From Swiss-Prot:
Location, primary (coarse class): mitochondrion
Gene3D superfamilies referenced in this protein's UniProt entry, alphabetically: Ribosomal protein L14
Annotated keywords: Mitochondrion, Ribonucleoprotein, Ribosomal protein
Family: Belongs to the universal ribosomal protein uL14 family.
Protein name per Swiss-Prot or TrEMBL: Large ribosomal subunit protein uL14m
GO molecular function: large ribosomal subunit rRNA binding; structural constituent of ribosome
Amino acid sequence: MINVQTVLKVADNSGAVFVSCIRLLNSSSRVGAGVGDTITVVVKKSIIKKNIKKSKEVKKGQVCSAVILRTIKGVKRWGNFFLRSSSNSVALINKYCLPIGSRLLGPVFREIRVNLKFSKIISIAQVTL
């Protein structure tokens, strides 16, 4: 579960490395946000590359929206099948729910597929679990 003030890794190549959650937008539960939920984050650490377009560049202190891809708590599926990740990871999105980066690193849980707005994130992911 992701709560306010949680530090998360960024799983795309948008330039941000670590972000901190400041608000839960579309949370599926009252306890915290899970896989597939949208949150508002602030960039804590970023890497500025010279070949990134200005529209895709993310700077330290910038407020963005993000969708949760993986959590340490994990996801329970039918038949007592349980999936966990080693880190809490997000992908940064714009106001049209399209990813800012052009590549996603690591696997993405299938529960993101429930929300049809994030179909582009699933299509650019390396592995879908």
